[in-house]
Amino acid sequence: MLKRVVRVLRCKLPACQGALRAGAALCAMLLLLAYSAPGIYGQVRERSQDYDAAQKRLAQGWNTWDVHSVTTQVLLPEGLAIRVALQRKTTLYGDAFLEDVLIGGGPGRLTEQVFPGPHAWDGSYTDARIVWRELDLRIQSAHAGKELVMLVTPLAKDKPGHLTPAVVFSASYLWNRPGTVERLADRIEAHGPSGTVPIYLAGTEAPFCDLPVSGPYLSSELKGPVGLSTGKRRSLEEIAQLVEEEHQAYEKTLGTPRSAAVDAIQTTLGWDTIYEPEGSRVISPVSRSWSVGWGGFVLFDWDTFFAATLAAIGDRDLAYANAIETLRESTPAGFVGNYARAGGWKSFDRSEPPVGAITVLGLYKKFHERWLLEETFAPLLSWNRWWQENRSAGMYLEYGSDGKNQPENLDDDSRGTRQGAIFESGLDNSPMYDEGFFNEKTHRLEIADVGLMGLYAADCDALAEIAAVLGKTPEEKELRERAKHYRESLATLWDEKSGMFLNKDLHTGRLNPRTSPTNFYPLLARAATPQQAQRMIQEHLLNAQEFGGDWVIPATPRNDPAFKDQNYWRGRIWGPMNYLVYLGLRNYDQAQVREELARKSLKLFEGEWTAKHHVHENYNSMTGAGDDVNSSDPFYHWGALLALIDYAETNDKPSPGDYVH
C-alpha cells in the first residue's frame, strides 16, 4: 500500500521527489496520511449503516446508470448492461453507427438530438425521443417485476430509396464486474454471480452485418416497432402493454391535477442520476455531458446540494445521497471543494458558496430522520469553521484561492489566482468582480462580499439548529454567535442612499455599486429589517430597469453595461439565484412578491421544457431562451429549481410567524 501511494505521488507531485530521497520514511508516512483522508483517493471513510442501506436501496435494478449513454440500461448491483445502438445506412453518411447517446451531445460531437421524456425515480419507466441522421424514433423502457422490457418505435417513415436503418442491442458487464455473455441461436445469455439473465429480441432479426460491436448482439431493421425483454420471451404486444402500464403508473406520481413541476424535476434528476463505480455510489452530477468531459463524473459543490433539494420531492434516498456524497468529498483542510472529479482529484484550493447546512436542515424538516444530521454534522461544522479561519478579513468574509494547498491540482491553472478566487463565488465571470484587488500573498479577492456573508450567516443559523437537535450545546452557542457577528457585519454594508446592501472594496474602502441577485442574500440571513427589505424589493428586485421585467432574475441588472453581454453570469438568468432569493423572501411578509417570482420562474422554465424538454443551465433575460448560446447546458439539473419555486409556493407556504418583524 505504501509503495503504491508513493509511486502515485511521485507522478502527481514531482516536487516531493527530493523530500522522498532525503527522508523517505517520514515523507512517505505524511503522504500516506494525507491520501488516507476522506474523499482524496477514493472513498476511504466508512459509511454509516443507515447511509449504506440508503445507497444499497438506490443501487438496485434496471436503470440508466451508465454515464456514457442515456439509451443504455444497466442492472445493479451486477453491472450487466444492455446498450441500444443505431445503424444508419445511406450514401450520404455511409454506415454511420451511434452507440453512445447524450442529451445535448457529448464533448466534441453534437450529432444526435435527444428530447428526454419521463424518467421515473427508480427507472421503472423511461421515455426518450432520438433524432439522428434523419432518423426520428422513440425509445421506451419499463420494469416487469425485476425484469426489463424495451420498445423502439420509429416516429417517421424513412425517405424512399433509403436503406432500412437498424437497431442493435448488445450486452456486456461494465466496470470490470464478473460475468460472461454468450450468443445462442435465439437469444443472448448473461451469466453473473446472481445467475443467468436471458435476453430476447421481439422483432425480425436482421441478416448478418458487420457492426462495430465487441460482444454478442441482437439486431433488427427498423421497419416498425422493435422490442426487447429479459427473463422470458415476450411478444411486441406484451412489451407495449407493459410499457404503457408503467407509463400510467408514472403519470399517477405527478398528482391531481397533473404537476408539471413534479414531472420536470423527476425527469431531470432521473436522466442525470448515474452509478459512479469509483466510489460505488449513486449520485446526480450536473449533467452527463459535463461528467463525460471530466472523466466519468464531476460533483460541483452547491450544484449537487441543490440536486439533493430537488430530489427530496420524490426520492428521499437520492436526496440524502447527493447531500452526503458532496460532504464526503471534503478536502484534508476540512472544506467542500468547488469540484470533485473522476480520478480522486478536486479543487484543493477553493470552495464554493456554503449552502450545505440549509440543504441538510431542509431534508431533516421534511423526513425527520436524526441519523442524517448525525452523518453530516461533523463535515458541515468543519466546513463552516474553515470559512471563518481561512476567508475572514476583520469583520467580513472574502473569496480566495489557496494555490499552495497540498496536493496541488497541477492541471488547474486557476488555482491560487484571481480567477480561482472568483470561481469560489460560483459566479465565474460576474461583473461584480471585474474590479477589486487580488492580494497575491493572501490569495484573496479583497472584497467584503454581501452574498457570501448572507449565505454564511444562514449556514450558521441552520447548523446551529442542527446542533440543537443533536444536543451539541457548545457548538450551537458558537454558531449562533458567529451568525450574529456576520449579521452585524452586514449591517455596516447597508447603503441608505441606494437602499441596498453593497459589496465593499477592502483595498480602497469604497462600496461597489455593481450588484447581482447575491445582494439580496442578506434576506436569507434575516439581516435586513422589514423596512430595508421593502426598499430592496421595491427599488431593485421589482424595478424593470434593474432586476424586474418579464424574464427574471437577471444575474446582472438591466442598467449595468455588462447586461447586454448575455454571457454566463453577465446578464443571464440562473435557477439557483432565483431559488435563493425566493428563500430569502420567505423570511419576510412578502407573499405577493413571492407568488410573482414563482409564477415568472415557472413561465421561464416552461418555455423550453414544453418545446424541447430542455432544462437549461441558464437563460437569456431578454428573450427567455436557453439554447441561444453554447454556454448553457440543455439538461443541467439546477435549471429545475425554477420549477421548484412554484412547487414550494404551492405546497409549502411559510408561516407568518416565521417572518422577520
Can you name each region flagged by the protein language model?
Residues 269-277, 315-335, 376-394, 482-500, ...:
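Long, well-ordered core segments of solenoidal/helical folds
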